[in-house]
Curated annotation (Swiss-Prot):
This is Large ribosomal subunit protein bL32. InterPro entries: Ribosomal_bL32, Ribosomal_bL32_bact, Ribosomal_zn-bd. The keyword Ribonucleoprotein applies. Pfam families: Ribosomal_L32p. Keywords: Ribonucleoprotein, Ribosomal protein. It comes from Aromatoleum aromaticum (strain DSM 19018 / LMG 30748 / EbN1). Belongs to the bacterial ribosomal protein bL32 family. The gene is rpmF.
């Protein structure tokens, strides 16, 4: 099992964790309906890239 030789200081620990944060998901606006959805996913109304691909639950 690997064991560290020297304790990592709080500064170095923070530098190591500098890129461990979560980023906001990329959102897109459907041009035909104006709805916001995740990129490369269908909108809540079932539209993807301007075409109706699935029926919505209320339809």
């Amino acid at each position: 099992m690997a064991v560290q030789q020297n304790k990592k200081s709080p500064s170095k620990r923070g530098m190591h964790r500098a890129h461990d944060f979560l980023t906001d998901p990329p959102l897109a606006v459907e041009p035909t309906t104006g709805e916001v959805h995740l990129r490369h996913h269908i909108s809540p109304s079932g539209v993807y890239r301007g075409k109706k691909v699935v029926k919505a639950k209320g339809e």
